[in-house]
Amino acid sequence: MRSRQLHNVSEDRETLSRRNKRSKTSLNGHIPIDLLIEIFLKLPVKSIATCRSVSKFWTYVLGRQDFTELFLTKSSSRPQLLFACANDNGYFFFSSNQPQNLDENSSPIAAYPLTHVPKSRDLGPPINGLVSLRGERILKGRIRPVDVSIIYNPSTGESLTLPKTNMTRKKIYTVTSFLGYDPIEKQYKVLSMNMSYEKHPKCEGYQVLTLGTGKLSWRMIKCCLNYQHPLKNSEICINGVLYYLAMVNGSSWPTRAVVCFDIRSEMFNFMEVYRELSYTTTLINYNNGKLGMLMGQEAHKTISGICRSFELWVLEDTVKHEWSKHVYLLPPLWKDAVANTRLYFAGMIGTSEIVLFRPDEPLCVFYYNIDRNTIKRVGIRGLEAFKYFRIFLNHVENVKLF
């Protein structure tokens, strides 16, 4: 009995010690910060966005970098599929759990509504749960809306409107913007390129904006390529390097190539690929760290039932530009499962599951397993009202607020 009492006293002292240690991190008599963080980590991301408006103290806690990183780490352990459905009113975002280990009788995917961003276009892939897009917004000091870049959080509906880029008024431009992230410096940057169309399309100005540094402003940078025409919806950011497809000067005429932009150094580089890139070339994050390229047969702009094979190229050495090439022959079932459906590569889950989709039919996606050489059609529920969509793999929820 005496021993049990001593044991209870010891436990009480340990509990009191933890509480005293925890209370040291509180401010002005509020609930201790680390206890609040533990509670907030259990809330859904939409609830966290609502909690920002409760008090200045909660806003402070939810804006701390340690909380943001903890939440992102937790979210990364359960990646999702992100659906972006477009119509005349902008983008409508949906999400669902990312299927793992698909079996023969795979159930339909249920897409749950997230948020809506009006009057928007040119959507880029999510970077740590944030996306870049363009839209017309009324900036401070202006009466009419102007075309600007926007950083948007599909999970919370929060957005950040960026200032208008600098450009020469005498010329007609369109602007292409890509979002990137440097995991070492933990910085988000936006690369913007002004496209001129006087004789033929080309970039005439490169600008960079760093997020989270106070005042938002664009800085002019130089590019080593004397001609390039970036292809929209082709970009991907891996380990602090932004890769995208572009038309660049070849030996005799422009050719498709992979352009690299280092987020930290803000330097461009040209990636040599000893093969002409086909219309179906899609950049992917292979095995969570390597640049990969999925390509169908050169004669086709999409993947359909008549295709017999496709290629997977993996960048093995970023300095020497050495690639490994893998050719996959599609199974006989491919022709019956896909038929005349025109598909696009969405990306790759892990090292074996390739996901394909048809943009104008948000009713299903296709999973091709390169190890088992099998193809599965999986239905989608919840997107029936839309006629166009895009799908992004390995999406994570983020509570970042700049």
UniProtKB/Swiss-Prot annotation:
* SMART domains, per database record: FBOX
Q: Where is the F-box domain?
A: 26-73
Superkingdom to which the source organism belongs: Eukaryota
Concerning Pfam families, the annotation shows: F-box (PF00646), FBA_3 (PF08268)
Looking up InterPro entries in the UniProt record yields: F-box-assoc_dom_typ3 (IPR013187), F-box-assoc_interact_dom (IPR017451), F-box-like_dom_sf (IPR036047), F-box_dom (IPR001810)
Q: Which SUPFAM superfamilies match?
A: F-box domain
**Region described as Disordered: spans on this chain:** 1-23
**Record NCBIfam families:** F_box_assoc_1 (TIGR01640)
Which PANTHER family does the protein's record reference?
BNAA05G37150D PROTEIN-RELATED (PTHR31111), F-BOX DOMAIN-CONTAINING PROTEIN (PTHR31111:SF62)
From the Swiss-Prot or TrEMBL record, give the protein name.
Putative F-box protein At3g23960
